[in-house]
Structure formats: C-alpha cells, structure tokens
Amino acid sequence: MNGVYIRVLVLQSPSETFIRIQHEPVGREEGLTTEQLKAIRFTPQFAAKEVEGILGPELTTAMEFCDWSTRNIAVPDEVFKNLHTFLNDTQMVEATGTTGFYSFVSRFTVGLDVDGKANNTVPIPE
C-alpha cells in the first residue's frame, strides 16, 4: 500500500517532501523498484494503464483507484470492482480510508510545513 500513499502525495502536493521521504524507503522494503517509484511519481493522473508493464496489474489498479479517489472523490464502479478483484472487503475499506486519510495528511503537513522542507525539491528515486 505504500505505492498508494506516495501516489496520493504526488497528486495532492507534487513538491511535498516530508512524507515522501518517509515512505520511499518503506516502499522499497515492500519490494517497489526504482522504476516503479518513478512510474508512481511521474505518470499523469488517470494514465496508470500506460505503466502497467512496470507496475503490474495489482499496483496499476490501485493507482487508478487512488487517482479517482484523490482527484474526483467518487470512484467509478468499474474502477472499484477492478481493485476489489485483488483485495477483500476489509482491504477495500483500508484502501479507501488510506487514500482519504493521506489526502488529509498531505494537506496538513504542507500547510504546517512540518519539517521546514515544503519548498524543497523532492529527490528523484535512484
């Protein structure tokens, strides 16, 4: 799910460094590659299918869900059902809650400039 956290941050605040720096190492520990991290960061919203070869079907579907939830709030039934093929009911609640919560967190940390780095450039994954 770390890919989802990072994607919310990309959509909410492209310059947000605090949380992204916190989550990139965790994403790597969970198996995300540099190429996947770059795809999550640089793929335009609603274009997850373009990087499915990099992300794989599950992460692509999660990214599509995240894009809809973060940018449109209402998630189309088809997008919800697609993610539900990979996640059980409890995990769907967690994915929806995580996406919404991280929308709040990104606004909170940027608004308060929690670590004094709100204006810093976010490093590109290496």
What are these regions, as identified by a protein language model?
Residues 1-126:
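Hydrophobic alpha-helical segments
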